[in-house]
């Protein structure tokens, strides 16, 4: 790249982050023209991306949590090929960045400005974009707090049911999923549809997901009614919840459920009874570590035939 120029769109809560300030100053000392803009309210990310592109920026840095990354990725995807994205993970979960092996240290993360950009996929449903993952579940009662009983039953997977709304009761509902050469129907407890691999602060739902294969990884947690009643015993006996998932890898999948399915798109809520998820292949250029586990090339190297 001839001009070392980038714009950092930083979540407003991170304005006083000294590590970020030091990292920015360090890049400036290296000769980068690095400008910073802060988000304050909904819609700011979209506006700031548009202003950055109009000002000639071709590298944009997203500084914040998974929601901030999603907002900026969505804004960039609306203007394909205009600029590439660097991720500066500053949230509590940082699920996409962790799975991609992006450093959580601001100075190291900004070194990706020098790394090649890769064309990666995005997930799409109902006109909304997600960079990392969509998770969904059913709740018969919604409360303000995470159910402690539910946490005890499900352990690390509890977020599946509490990530969007705090469900005080765990129950299944009938669902049907259909995609190319794939059809599943039955009682469904929860599901994950991943472009990335993990959600909810490190819980791996789609362990083999790649961001440049043009596919979404589907993980279904089925639940015949008799299984719901014995789920606690199964888990306490060492029957890992990971073994219970039905998995598929598809360019798109249609989901129909008997009652409203609560979906979490990288923190954004969505609800529906008939939804179509699709991968938008190569929709975004992102700077990733050369050995990122989410890249197909890395996968081939580490898993030779």
Curated annotation (Swiss-Prot):
Its cofactor is Mg(2+); Ca(2+). SUPFAM superfamilies: NAD kinase/diacylglycerol kinase-like. Keywords: ATP-binding, Cytoplasm, Kinase, Lipid biosynthesis, Lipid metabolism, Magnesium, Metal-binding, Nucleotide-binding, Phospholipid biosynthesis, Phospholipid metabolism, Transferase. Binds 1 Mg(2+) ion per subunit. Ca(2+) may be able to substitute. One of its GO terms (biological process) is phospholipid biosynthetic process. ATP binds at residues 39, 65-71, 92. Pfam families: DAGK_cat (PF00781), YegS_C (PF19279). Its EC number is 2.7.1.-. One of its GO terms (molecular function) is magnesium ion binding. Mg(2+) binds at residues 210, 213, 215. Its main location: cytoplasm. It comes from the Bacteria. It is found in: Cytoplasm. GO terms for cellular component: cytoplasm; plasma membrane. The active site is at 268 (proton acceptor). Residues 1-129 form the DAGKc domain. Probably phosphorylates lipids; the in vivo substrate is unknown. Belongs to the diacylglycerol/lipid kinase family. YegS lipid kinase subfamily. This is Probable lipid kinase YegS-like. It comes from Pseudomonas fluorescens (strain Pf0-1).
């Amino acid at each position: 790249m001839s001009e070392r120029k980038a714009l950092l769109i930083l979540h407003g809560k991170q304005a006083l982050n000294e590590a970020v300030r030091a990292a920015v100053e360090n890049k400036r000392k290296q000769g980068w023209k690095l400008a910073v803009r802060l988000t304050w309210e909904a819609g700011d990310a979209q506006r700031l991306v548009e202003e950055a592109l109009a000002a000639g920026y071709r590298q944009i840095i997203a500084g914040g949590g998974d929601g901030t990354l999603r907002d900026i990725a969505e804004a960039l995807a609306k203007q394909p090929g205009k600029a590439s994205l660097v991720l500066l993970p500053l949230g509590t979960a940082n699920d996409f960045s962790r799975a991609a092996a992006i450093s959580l240290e601001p100075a190291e993360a900004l070194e990706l400005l020098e790394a090649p950009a890769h064309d990666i996929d995005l997930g799409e449903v109902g006109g909304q974009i997600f960079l990392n993952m969509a998770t969904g579940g059913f709740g018969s009662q919604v409360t303000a707090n995470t159910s402690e009983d539910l946490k005890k039953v499900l352990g690390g997977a509890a977020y599946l049911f509490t990530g969007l709304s705090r469900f005080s009761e765990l129950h299944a509902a009938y669902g049907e999923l259909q995609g190319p050469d794939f059809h599943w129907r039955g009682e469904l407890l929860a599901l994950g549809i991943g472009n990335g691999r993990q959600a909810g602060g490190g819980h791996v739902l789609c362990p083999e997901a790649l961001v440049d294969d043009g596919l979404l990884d589907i993980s279904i947690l089925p639940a015949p009614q008799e299984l719901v009643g014995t789920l606690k015993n199964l888990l306490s006996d060492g029957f890992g919840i990971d073994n219970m998932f039905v998995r598929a890898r598809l360019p798109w999948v249609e989901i129909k459920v008997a009652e409203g399915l609560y979906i979490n798109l990288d923190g954004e809520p969505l609800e529906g009874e008939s939804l179509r998820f699709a991968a938008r292949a190569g929709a975004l250029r992102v700077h990733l570590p050369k050995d990122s586990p989410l890249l197909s090339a890395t996968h081939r190297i580490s898993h030779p035939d």
